[in-house]
């Protein structure tokens, strides 16, 4: 049997992390079994579905490289198929027309609730033989079995059973002729030959209804697996107050897709004590029986740790392709300065996100207007003039501009003046970067370049002279 899974988001908003994890699990299960992964857009909610949301879902899937083998299919383009199946069910007696008014249904609901009963349709039209005009408004309901139960073996939660007496005669076509969500899902899974439905636990109550419709259609019933929800680190349902929720917001915040995928796969699934997984390892090891039934807690610090790991573990050239977007957001002109791959090597240990990296690299490419006030006050003092003049001259004398030779020039300055490296290094750092923090000074000065470094040292010397004149 060829394994076929699907991810079927409703385009009413962005791709959130819960949806992304569901998509990842479905994708991994298909890839693990050499099967196929289908993308289906469930856009039957015409009022809330938007083209922008569809684009956001696609962007998120593409950024995570969760490529699909079929689709995207759109439910709104399949209404003729759904209605043909409903008409067939009406002929076979597995569905019926319901003419009950909203007023009657509301009165029925209130009566049942007053008695402490679960509100459900009483089946009046199911057994009615009244004649109605062809143009009289009606809905179509599924004639749910009235006896027995629905049992399915959830691949994560184990056997789950629902009594058919608890289930309503579901509306499958509205008065305007449009099919309903639960029905469209059934026909889609049937037509697309979906073998395994992996989705959120909020769909558990839909499953027995969908199974009954599939059986009425004499269609194969897929295997179901319902993934637990994701909570914030405070135990409450994940929301915007816990930080980013949209997948693309994590891109904007400077996370690599590999970090988010690695984090999401471990958010409810485990393989021994292993924390770091390549995409190939995820595919190799993923199984549904290793997915936890319990809700997971989203921990941003853990994601940040993973992101820092991947910034340094992945090839710098690859990381640079993602960094480029953030550089553009900061409007930094990188034509005069180190290659971005070299920048990743320089700043990788210091920066936990690509956004942080982009925001802290400008001095490598562009001159700064002024020195950081605190750093200048502390390190650009008259006592720093001589170390800066000596190190400037030694840097100017370098013919082979390497980080090693830059280091020798700084060390030689400290030796010549008989001072500690800090007496040379800190004024030099503020002079060439404008701030009090940077990567190792030799590689920083080397990356900034000989001409620009000397110009900035002269600017720092002018700054010191101006301060002296003002005193």
Swiss-Prot record:
Binding residue positions for ATP: 240
Binding sites annotated in the UniProt record for Zn(2+): 98, 100, 125, 127
GO molecular function: ATP binding; glutamate-tRNA ligase activity; tRNA binding; zinc ion binding
Record keyword Zinc present: yes
InterPro entries recorded: aa-tRNA-synth_I_cd-bd, aa-tRNA-synth_I_codon-bd_sub2, aa-tRNA-synth_I_CS, aa_tRNA-synth_I_cd-bd_sf, Glu-tRNA-ligase_bac/mito, Glu/Gln-tRNA-synth, Glu/Gln-tRNA-synth_Ib_cat-dom, GluQ/Sye
Motif segment ('KMSKS' region): 237-241
Chief location bin: cytoplasm
Assembly and interaction partners: Monomer.
More about this protein: This is the smallest aminoacyl-tRNA synthetase of E.coli; it does not bind glutamate in the absence of cognate tRNA, which is therefore required for activation of the amino acid substrate.
Protein name, entry field: Glutamate--tRNA ligase
């Amino acid at each position: 049997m060829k394994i076929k899974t699907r991810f079927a988001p409703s385009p009413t908003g962005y791709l959130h992390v819960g949806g992304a994890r569901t998509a990842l699990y479905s994708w991994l299960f298909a890839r693990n079994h050499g099967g196929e992964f289908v993308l289906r857009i469930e856009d039957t909610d015409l009022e809330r579905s938007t083209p922008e949301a569809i684009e956001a879902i696609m962007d998120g899937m593409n950024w995570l490289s969760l490529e699909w083998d079929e689709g995207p299919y759109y439910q709104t383009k399949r209404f003729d198929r759904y209605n043909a199946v409903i008409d067939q069910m009406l002929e076979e007696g597995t569905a019926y027309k319901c003419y009950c008014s909203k007023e009657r249904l509301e009165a029925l609901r209130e009566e049942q609730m007053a008695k402490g009963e679960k509100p459900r349709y009483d089946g009046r039209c199911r057994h009615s033989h009244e004649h109605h005009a062809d143009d009289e408004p009606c809905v179509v309901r599924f004639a749910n079995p009235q006896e027995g139960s629905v049992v399915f073996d959830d691949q994560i939660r184990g056997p789950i059973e629902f009594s058919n007496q608890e289930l309503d005669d579901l509306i499958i076509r509205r008065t305007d002729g449009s099919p309903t969500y639960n029905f469209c899902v059934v026909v889609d899974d049937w037509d697309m030959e979906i073998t395994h439905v992996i989705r959120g636990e909020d769909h558990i109550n839909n499953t027995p209804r969908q199974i009954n419709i599939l059986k009425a259609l004499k269609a194969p019933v897929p295997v179901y697996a319902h993934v637990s929800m994701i909570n914030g680190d405070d135990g409450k349902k994940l929301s915007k107050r816990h930080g980013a929720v949209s997948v693309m917001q994590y891109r904007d915040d400077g996370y690599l897709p590999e970090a988010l995928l690695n984090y999401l796969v471990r958010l409810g699934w485990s393989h021994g004590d292993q924390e770091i997984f390549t995409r190939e390892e995820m595919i190799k090891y993923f199984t549904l029986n290793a997915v936890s039934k319990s809700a997971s807690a989203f921990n941003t610090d853990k994601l940040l740790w993973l992101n820092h790991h991947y910034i340094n573990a992945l090839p710098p050239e690859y990381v640079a392709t993602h960094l480029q977007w953030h550089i553009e957001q900061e409007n930094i002109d990188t034509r005069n300065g180190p290659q971005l791959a070299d920048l990743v090597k320089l700043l990788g240990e210091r920066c936990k996100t690509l956004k942080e990296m982009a925001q802290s690299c400008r001095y490598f490419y562009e001159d700064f207007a002024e020195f950081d006030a605190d750093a200048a006050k502390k390190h650009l003092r008259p006592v720093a003039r001589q170390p800066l003049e000596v190190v400037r001259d030694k840097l100017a004398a370098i013919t082979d501009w390497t980080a090693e030779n830059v280091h020798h020039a700084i060390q030689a300055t400290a030796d010549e003046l008989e001072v500690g490296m800090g007496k040379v290094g800190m004024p030099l750092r503020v002079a060439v970067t404008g701030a009090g923090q940077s990567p190792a000074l030799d590689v920083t000065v080397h990356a900034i370049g000989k001409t620009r470094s000397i110009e900035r040292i002269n600017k720092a010397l002018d700054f010191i002279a101006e301060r002296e004149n003002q005193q």
